[in-house]
Amino acid sequence: MADETTMRAGRGPGRACGRVSGVRILVVEDEPKMTALLARALTEEGHTVDTVADGRHAVAAVDGGDYDAVVLDVMLPGIDGFEVCARLRRQRVWTPVLMLTARGAVTDRIAGLDGGADDYLTKPFNLDELFARLRALSRRGPIPRPPTLEAGDLRLDPSEHRVWRADTEIRLSHKEFTLLEALIRRPGIVHTRAQLLERCWDAAYEARSNIVDVYIRYLRDKIDRPFGVTSLETIRGAGYRLRKDGGRHALPR
């Protein structure tokens, strides 16, 4: 894809202004021609550029370096760009990430952005557009850490995929976490089964499926019953609601 990108990298009279100088950028790309193209072009723009060719080295470099932005290819040997970005966010590294990939499907873009990427550029691309996006990321600076979501003493950390009840950490599966996150983002609001199915499952599950009820039960077994509380309420004929106060304690018998 490097040749195609070069062909679209013309710098005409309409080139954008507002260069941000002195920016340190890490380029994570395993294709040598593309790496050389990006490193040369970014250096000519006045940036300091480092390069690595695989996901593991990318995580180590960003975690140990002081970068202003990362240009991250998705298709990498070892661990891919999606996982690289997710690991960085779990490690509380908030350096802006621009995903760079030949995969232009909407689902791929969503996966990258949901995983913590700040922007997404599909190959083949125009270098001037890349520069403009990096300028925007540099002006924005490091993204703030996503807030911990809370309902009473129940806490969910979206960036680290961790959940606690008071001081006790609770282990959830990926789907349990996704369902709880949908509920805790709007505590006190009734969510219909259809809404939860749409947000947390793919189109393979039909509206009449009882998969939502099954996972609500799984969640209750982990976040409620061991602590003697009821936070997940069934609203008959409507759906489910997570209490804003994190759950009422069961009355002693």
From Swiss-Prot:
Q: Name one GO cellular component term.
A: plasma membrane
The record's section on Pfam families has:
Response_reg, Trans_reg_C
Domain of life of the organism encoding this protein? Bacteria
Picking any one GO molecular function of the record gives: transcription cis-regulatory region binding
Q: Which PANTHER family match?
A: REGULATOR OF RPOS, TRANSCRIPTIONAL REGULATORY PROTEIN TCRX-RELATED
Question: What is the phylogenetic placement of the source species in the record?
Answer: Bacteria, Bacillati, Actinomycetota, Actinomycetes, Mycobacteriales
**Per the UniProt record, which residue ranges are transmembrane?**
none
UniProt cross-references to InterPro entries, sorted A to Z: CheY-like_superfamily (IPR011006), OmpR/PhoB-type_DNA-bd (IPR001867), Sig_transdc_resp-reg_receiver (IPR001789), WalR-like (IPR039420), WH-like_DNA-bd_sf (IPR036388)
Q: Where is the Response regulatory domain?
A: 24-138
Role of this protein: Member of the three-protein two-component system HK1/HK2/TcrA.
Q: Which residues carry this modification: 4-aspartylphosphate?
A: 73
Indicate the residues that the entry says bind DNA.
146-244
Organism field: Mycobacterium tuberculosis (strain ATCC 25618 / H37Rv)
- Subcellular location field: Cytoplasm
Coiled-coil features, chain-numbered ranges = none
**Name assigned to this protein:** Transcriptional regulatory protein TcrA
- Protein modification: Phosphorylated by HK2.
Extra information = Was identified as a high-confidence drug target.
Q: What is the annotated quaternary arrangement, including any partners?
A: Interacts with HK2.
Query: What processes does the entry annotate via GO biological process terms?
Result: negative regulation of phosphorelay signal transduction system; regulation of DNA-templated transcription
Gene3D superfamilies tied to this protein: 3.40.50.2300, 6.10.250.690, Winged helix-like DNA-binding domain superfamily/Winged helix DNA-binding domain
For this UniProt record, give its keywords in alphabetical order, as a comma-separated list.
Cytoplasm, DNA-binding, Phosphoprotein, Transcription, Transcription regulation, Two-component regulatory system
